[in-house]
């Protein structure tokens, strides 16, 4: 069964998790990594089960912790080609590898 949770949504940050068979994907990382971990724990999700992060776009309220997530976990961050093109400066600012 698929489990999901809205970890937060709004102008201050956005993040969602989807889990199936103890494997998860994180959609957006608009909070600090510490806040994301806390929100996951508070909602009964395991941070270590995250396989990858998918970003809807590169505004900070969706991608704030993307660079930190990638560097600390070594896991992939996926961004659509259109978002990459439109957000070249944001990729640098967010330090996404």
Give the location of each predicted region.
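Active-site metal-binding motif and surrounding structural segment of the metallo-beta-lactamase
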Residues: 34-84
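Conserved beta-strand hairpin/beta-sheet module of binuclear metal-dependent hydrolase folds
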Residues: 1-43
